[in-house]
Amino acid sequence: MALLELQNLKKYFATQKAVDDISLHVEQGQIFGLLGPNGAGKTTLIRMITGIFYPDEGSILFDGKKFDPIKDVGKIGYMPEERGLYKKMKIGEQAMYLAQLKGLSHSEAQSKIKKWFARFEMDSWWNKKVEDLSKGMGQKLQFVTTVLHEPKLIILDEPFSGLDPVNSNLIKDEIFNLSRNGATIIFS
């Protein structure tokens, strides 16, 4: 069964057509790539899938039902290309804040963050500020905060940007693990 189904999506900005009649099915547990040149509409399409934008025409089905951005947003993990981390905030506090925004209790969030931080060798980072991280370290933090609430759909926009080969492999391995455990993953 398709976790995500897009039917004839169109999006305009004034007279500019950003997305033109896109239809696709992404199955549960599938890893799916959105490919296209700059300006092809990939980011606009992602923003419609996440409920940031609404399509002007067409429909989005999520888990067999009409997509409801309010109800379904907690089932989606989105790591945008432009990172949204608060530079002055401590890493542990930021991860807790983002986890609780996604509906995790304090104790549940703390437990999951500790597990992911250990897995990514970030245990000692808890009290560091985001502004003190390299681009690759920030990328690891952003990945962790995207997946720690165990979303059904994970959307990753350039997830390997700024990572060295070792950390690229670590993220890649985790993406495959998440897929094997049933998460659906979309790359752009």
Show the residue positions of the predicted features.
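Helix-to-loop junction immediately C-terminal to a conserved catalytic motif
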Residues: 50
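Conserved ABC transporter NBD signature motif
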Residues: 58-74
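Conserved ABC ATPase "signature" region
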Residues: 96, 100, 108-125
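Catalytic Walker B motif of ABC-type/P-loop ATPase nucleotide-binding domains
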Residues: 154-158
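Helix N-cap at the start of a conserved alpha-helix in ABC-type nucleotide-binding domains
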Residues: 165-167
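Helical segment within the ABC ATPase nucleotide-binding domain
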Residues: 169-181
